[in-house]
Amino acid sequence: MNKEKKVDIVGKIPKWAWLCLSLLSAVVLWFFLSKNPTTSLSFPPLPEVFKAYHTMAVERGKFWPDVLASMRSVGIGFVLGFLFGVPVAFLMAWYRPVRFILEPWIQFVRNIPPLAYVPLVVLAAGVGAKAQIVVICIATFLTITVTVFQGVINVDETLIKAARVLGANDTVLFVKVIFPATTPFIITAVRLGISVALTTLIAAESTGAVAGLGMRIKALSQVFENAEMMFYIIVVGVIGMLAEKILKFFERRLTSWQEKREI
């Protein structure tokens, strides 16, 4: 009974209030970390972090070119990874020989940090934007392939058998059964893929980038401009959160037929 009352009380508090409480908690924690001699270098005062926007965007004119350069690399790399990953995942799930040939290598490369194969990519693709896109594409491809593959092989076998009994061929089975049932996994793969693309930025932009969020974070850390570096780190996090919110919005629209469970 007490548990039910607690759940009801939590449910009555609007989400915006929880968001405000979360932000307030983060600000308070940041304040104490910025005053602690042990952590003050890693967490400069928030006013200095906010001032870093003026420093990087207005005084130096670096911020927006960095954002555009990174979004270009992330966008192209993610799209290529998605376009390659989804078909490969379906082929692996549908044809066992393809699975037996590709799956060991996908699992092998997936466990290698992107930073480890950056030198190989640079040797093959050269220095610059092309190498960045290739690194992000590889990381995204691996994540999307594994996620979508798991979705396809977990489609209810009863649905497939029922469609076969009704005379569905492979094309009809894919369009009417497999693809709709896998849609939630594809959306999850997109969300994970974007997250992986953003976290791969620093590794990707170590290939000789002249602009970019990841490159700038690394450059600022080398000269100990901690406030500016922290500002860029926060920007990467904000971009990831915005992408997550947008994808959740479309997920609710595309998978409204699914039963939802509040946690």
Locations of the language-model features?
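Generic hydrophobic transmembrane alpha-helix motif, especially the helices
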Residues: 107-143, 150-151
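Transmembrane alpha-helical segments of polytopic membrane transport and secretion proteins
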Residues: 1-24, 245-263
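Short cytoplasmic-facing helical segments at TM-TM junctions of multi-pass membrane proteins
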Residues: 147-189, 213, 217
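Glycine-rich helix-loop "coupling/hinge" segments at transmembrane-helix boundaries
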Residues: 123-124, 199-236, 255-263
